[in-house]
């Protein structure tokens, strides 16, 4: 059996999942990558090639016939070629009593004195014990392979990160990487599919099996579909033979579920205060009917600003960046949609922030202290981040912060919904809101923005930004639809 460094990545990305690794090993087809995922793959190759261009003359092993790449790599190392691109290593060993062939393909081998540095190029901005463990394990496996084949350790292991910096990765002799490969081997040797709980943030993060796994979980009424049942709790319940919401409700009262310990990090933790809510979610998932807990607490105003941001995560941009600040007043005196967009030049981020402050100030001038209604904490967090980044000279951002109304906790305190997630996209569909765009979503919008940034065609850029603006405008309309639905409860 062949085990590769890519198997470790499959185990971790987009989120940790042993079932994905198993299905890939079984040859089960995945859905096509999203537009965003395809763009990120392209950007990753561009990032890698740009770094390669800084390294001088190199030998490209990927141009060699596949069955000759391992021997060509070793010969090139022996000949002390300055830079070896896309090297390939293979080494037969025994892991957990099984004979396996371990394969690794580091991006760069860079001669430094008499020894080689092993370096991989990644878009990730941070690589350490707390960020992207799989990258460190990948490099450690390359280091172990190099040592077995060459006979001496590599000079160092490094990552060329998304910031352009080069970070060192500690080498432990390959112990951690080989231990992880033992986990990989155990999954690949399974004769039946391993149990994996589904989860909204886990499975909707870009996994190619989400449609397959979600449909199967719904068909078997898996307990992991119950809101607030985290991955550790789902695994614990499943191992105890409790696999459905019905079994959960019939097996536990609040106190007993509260006392149940489930895996949590390296140890265990009681379910605790979440037990009551979990049982409520289980009950409504069985009945399919929502449950009113308390009056909906929304402050009375004539008008409300629906407020939504579109941003790029730090792994895809030099800084975590909001590229669109969307606002629209609804109520007795509605406004047109307002989209404050960051510029495409070097100072575009600041331009977008200033445009938002100007637009928000105009709203306050016309409407007074009007609530800015949003969904979840993204807006509050990022306003605070931008105040630290660029300041708030006239106090407009501080005023927005004072007037923020997060509709998510308002909803959760008032109503238990028979849904697997309180994501706005899920709740808006539940209340009957319909969108007009065939394609939409945060990842889709990021893909459009990246394409708009990369193109020199002004017409194409404007068309893509127009689609993003339309998506954001419908996000605001969806928030208002949920808001109105809540007020009628």
Regions found by a protein language model. Name each.
Residues 1-114:
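Metal-dependent nuclease catalytic cores that hydrolyze phosphodiester bonds in DNA/RNA
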Residues 20, 210, 378:
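Cys/His-rich metal-chelating microdomains
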Residues 48, 52, 56, 143, ...:
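Short, amphipathic alpha-helical segments that act as regulatory/interfacial helices
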Residues 67-71, 250-254, 264, 439-451:
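Short linear loop/turn motifs
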Residues 82-182, 321-322, 326, 331, ...:
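Mg2+/Mn2+-dependent nuclease catalytic core
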Residues 112, 116-118, 122-124, 297-479, ...:
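Structural signature of nuclease core domains in nucleic-acid processing machines
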Residues 126-133, 145-218, 363-366, 386-402, ...:
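Metal-dependent nuclease catalytic regions and adjoining charged, substrate-binding loops involved
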Residues 213-329, 338-339, 349:
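C-terminal extensions
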């Amino acid at each position: 059996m062949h085990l590769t460094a890519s198997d470790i990545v499959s185990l971790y990305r987009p989120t940790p999942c042993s079932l994905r690794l198993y299905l890939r090993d079984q040859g089960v087809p995945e859905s096509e990558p999203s537009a965003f995922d395809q763009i990120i793959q392209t950007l990753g190759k561009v990032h890698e090639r740009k770094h390669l261009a800084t390294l001088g003359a190199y030998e490209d092993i990927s141009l060699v016939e596949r069955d000759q790449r391992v021997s060509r790599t070793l010969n090139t190392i022996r000949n002390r070629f300055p830079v070896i691109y896309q090297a390939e290593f293979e080494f037969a060993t025994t892991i957990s009593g099984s004979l396996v062939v371990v394969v690794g393909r580091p991006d760069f081998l860079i001669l430094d004195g008499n020894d080689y540095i092993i370096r991989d190029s990644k878009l990730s901005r941070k690589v350490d014990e707390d960020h992207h463990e799989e990258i460190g394990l990948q490099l450690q496996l390359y280091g172990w392979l190099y040592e077995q084949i060459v006979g001496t350790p590599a000079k160092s292991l490094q990552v060329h990160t998304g910031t352009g910096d080069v970070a060192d990765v500690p080498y432990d002799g390959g112990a951690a990487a080989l231990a992880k490969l033992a986990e990989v081997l155990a999954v690949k040797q399974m004769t039946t599919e391993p149990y994996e709980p589904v989860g909204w943030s886990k499975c909707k993060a870009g996994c190619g099996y989400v449609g397959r796994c979600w449909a199967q979980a719904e068909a078997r009424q898996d307990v992991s579909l119950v809101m607030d049942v985290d991955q550790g709790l789902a695994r614990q319940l499943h191992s105890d033979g409790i696999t459905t919401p019905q079994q959960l409700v019939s097996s536990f009262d609040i106190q007993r579920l509260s006392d149940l310990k489930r895996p949590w990090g390296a140890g265990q933790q009681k379910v605790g205060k979440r037990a009551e809510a979990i049982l409520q979610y289980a009950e409504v998932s069985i009945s399919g009917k929502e449950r009113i807990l308390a009056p909906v607490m929304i402050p009375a105003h004539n008008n409300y600003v629906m407020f939504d941001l579109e941003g790029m995560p730090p792994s895809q941009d030099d800084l975590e960046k909001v590229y669109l600040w969307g606002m629209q007043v609804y109520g007795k005196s509605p406004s047109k949609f307002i989209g404050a967009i960051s510029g495409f030049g070097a100072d575009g981020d600041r331009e977008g922030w200033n445009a938002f402050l100007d637009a928000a100030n105009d709203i306050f001038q016309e409407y007074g202290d009007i609530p800015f209604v949003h969904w979840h904490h993204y807006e509050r967090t990022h306003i605070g981040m931008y105040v630290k980044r660029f300041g708030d000279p006239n106090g407009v951002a501080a005023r927005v912060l004072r007037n923020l109304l997060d509709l998510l906790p308002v909803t959760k305190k008032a109503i238990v919904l028979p849904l697997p997630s309180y994501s706005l996209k899920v709740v808006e569909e539940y209340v009957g809101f319909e969108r007009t765009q065939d394609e939409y979503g945060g990842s889709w919008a990021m893909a459009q923005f990246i394409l708009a940034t990369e193109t020199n065609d002004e017409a194409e850029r404007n068309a893509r930004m127009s689609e993003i603006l339309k998506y954001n405008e419908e996000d605001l309309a969806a928030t208002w639809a949920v808001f109105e639905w809540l007020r009628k409860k």
